[in-house]
Amino acid sequence: MTVTMTLGQLAEALGATLKGSEALQITGLATLQEAGPGQLSFLANKQYRKYLDNCQAAAVLLQAADAEGFAGNALIVADPYLAYARISHLFDPKPKAVAGIHPSAVVAEDAQVDASASIGPFVVIESGARIGANVSIGAHCVIGARCVVGEGGWLAPRVTLYHDVTIGKRVVIQSGAVIGGEGFGFANEKGVWRKIAQIGGVTIGDDVEIGVNTAVDRGALSDTRIADGVKLDNQIQIAHNVQIGEHTAMAACVGISGSTRIGKHCTIAGGVGMVGHIDVCDNVFVSGMTMVTRSITEPGAYSSGTAMQPLADWRKSAARIRQLDDMSKRLQQLEKRVDTVTSGGQPTSEG
């Protein structure tokens, strides 16, 4: 699919100040280094400023300060990256869904499917499920009993919703994601694990995005809950009973253990692990590969990772870490000797 828009149309859509030809035709988007005639680019990170002067793009999204002295066409905006995000959808080549149910789909008699929904090949929709207006469900998806998929939802091929999953409006779920699988619940009886039925569900708010091969387990008793605007990257594990607050984002390979509660507007970087039954307050940033073992009660940035260094240096550091306990004991002994010498053998005023 090829889309062509004029620079003037894009300026109007963004509320941008136009510098250059209003009639200039734009056919796509590209980076500053790769853009050519007909393509629009953007400068959002100052480290790429060096590519601007030699950029071959038809036009560039710029802040006012960067537009000064720039000889080419520009759309001047307060936030070039946000402007790029907004117009990226205008040039998205993703095929548009067509309303209707594919003949190979299996839909339970009592399931409700809105006439405007698109149900792809070999989809299974089980008893009591409800599919809202303008929903797109890709090939080989399974929608379990009594599930609800809200208006404008988009499920890529091979998404699985177990029974009793409720999804809000405009939710995007990528291929391989499994929502509502049984949580990891077992009771130990004299060394033997006895399974606990997971009788809760999953509730997902509006405008949530869930990445490829991410798993969100159903609750043991009450629902696992993901609030409005949450963004989950690929290969994330959300265990049973977890609660995630509005507009929190998690990068790939995060693991959240059962019954942990995460607040609003948090950013959890890649590979973070959180133990179960802890609380994380609003507005927290956790750096990549951090292991969170206790509740976080104050907003701010947190890390437990070790920064990269040359291997030989890291080995020396690791060896010193093993010696810390012994070094601490030796330091305490040295402090006692210094105390004795400086006090003339008499007890100090501190005891």
Curated annotation (Swiss-Prot):
Which species is this record about? Answer: Pseudomonas putida (strain W619)
| GO BP terms | lipid A biosynthetic process
Named from the GO MF annotations, one term is:
N-acyltransferase activity
Family membership: Belongs to the transferase hexapeptide repeat family. LpxD subfamily.
Q: Main role?
A: Catalyzes the N-acylation of UDP-3-O-acylglucosamine using 3-hydroxyacyl-ACP as the acyl donor. Is involved in the biosynthesis of lipid A, a phosphorylated glycolipid that anchors the lipopolysaccharide to the outer membrane of the cell.
HAMAP family on file: LpxD
State the source organism's domain of life.
Bacteria
Name of the molecule in the record = UDP-3-O-acylglucosamine N-acyltransferase
Instruction: Spell out the CDD domains in the cross-references.
Output: LbH_LpxD
Q: Any signal peptide, and if so, which residues? A: none
